[in-house]
Amino acid sequence: MKSSAMPETDENRGSEPMATRWFAARLTSVFFLLEVINILHHAMWRDELQVWSFCEHSHSLRELLYLTRYEGHPHAWQFLVYSISRLSSNPVAMQVLHLAIATMTAYVVAHYSPFPRLQKVLIVFGYFLFYEYAAISRDYALGILCLFSFCAVFRPGPQKRYGLLVIFLALMAESNIYALILALSLALMIVFEALQAHESRQYLFLRAREIACAVILFLTAVFISLLHMRPPTDASWNFRSNFTAHIHTGFSGTMAMIWRAFVPIPRPSHQFWSSNLLGGHTRLMALLSILLLCISILFFIRKRTVLFLYLSGLGALLLFKHLVYAGYLRHDGHAFILFLACMWLGKSYPEQRFPLRMAETAAVQLRPYQDRLFLGLLAGQVIAALIASVIAFKVPFSEAKVASDFLRSKRMENMFIIGDADFAVSSIAGYLNREIYYPRGDRMGSYVLWDNKRTRPQEPILELARRRAADQHQDVLVILNVRDPSAHEIASFQGSIVGSEDYYLYLIQTEKPKTSSSSGRPIVPLSLGP
């Protein structure tokens, strides 16, 4: 019987890359269109607008570096936003930039990753790539784009494109602390791999100059990143205070990170963000995290280089969470991103027998179920993304944009405004593109400076506003993010996903002598109601 298989030709060999490109283009296009909908319904919150305000008020990169000295973040994302802010004064431009980065990440996964098409679709539309690191404009997306680009370029063995790899690692180091941790783990993985094979060491010796330049570039990027993340002496936060504030989470709180990252399904409520269905059951999440950890280790236990990457990266993330900063889901999510990177890189390595018989046996027995377990995790991520996107479609992430639009509609945007708490009201200042008075720190500003000046005692906000109105003979608008029952608000904006960005507005008017109109009728003030 003759085989029906077609003979392999150059045309057939080229059809598969073409099909891959078309699939990647279609998947990326769908991602882009759906993400546009997400962004159109996303009101930016303070952590997004803080960077924009810094860039808007900086006349040079040197001034930007000075203003952001309290932020504790490297500057790659800030420099990108600064370049965009030279072209537009609308913060939506930053969202467009972030959308471009998220879309490029989706394309890298869709085109270059070794996963089957179904898994690619689930990865791209998972919680972190579709919502957390796409709809919300922060520096995390840049680090993840560079991580997956590293995976796309990486090849096992000594003949690597070290120059390109180190560029991605350096950009990761300059993105945020979590990307820096993963970049260090990837660099150590390359060293670990080289130590395992004699031919790798010989090849590296022949390219010693190129390798030395790559090492110097990466270490320089790490040094600059750490230098910029170091808080000034007058900062209102430091690593030691973070340690004492968050160490109480204990072992269970730290281990729960794995469950939160791998199964980020939130509570179906309007304040879903950073929540989990098992929230409040920390010990249960810790136990499930240990189970997930053991199973995930078995995924890589027969691929030693990838296992080294996974254990070193995950161990560093857990230590950072336990000893430095407990963080939120957006930080914990890097554990799952690391898992995806290890799954990607693991496709390139042949399996090797593990020396511990019990672990080897468990890995062999798990092998037939790996794809189904991986699909289950990816499906859970998509469910989380769907819940988040549906709620965010109906509920404003922050009330800052609505409050800002209200002030413009009532022609109150140019009034003297007192805002507290500064970190919450800074979102309104960002949307209004103007400075307001922050009692915390006793200064005018749009962004927040996290220095110790803002921690000094202050007088009650409404009393301060009344004194200001009397002294300056000028009406004062007070914006609080916590209702003051002693005063009557002229408007309130409640129900945001970020609960601390609900707002209450109070108008403090100067006392004017009572007058009558020529007709003898009392003058009625203009209504401020909606």
Predicted regions and their residues:
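Luminal/periplasmic acceptor-recognition loop/helix of membrane-associated glycosyltransferases
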Residues: R408, M412, R434-P530
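Membrane-interface alpha helices of multi-pass inner-membrane proteins
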Residues: L33, E63, L129-Y133, F148, ...
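Short acidic/glycine- and proline-prone juxtamembrane loop motifs at membrane-interface regions
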Residues: A135-L142
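Membrane-interface transmembrane helices that cradle and orient dolichyl/undecaprenyl
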Residues: S149-L164, A194-H198
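Transmembrane-helix motifs of polytopic, lipid-linked glycan transferases
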Residues: V96-V121, C294-I297
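Signature aromatic-anchored transmembrane alpha helix within multi-pass, membrane-resident enzymes
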Residues: I216-F218, I290-L291, G315, E351-I387
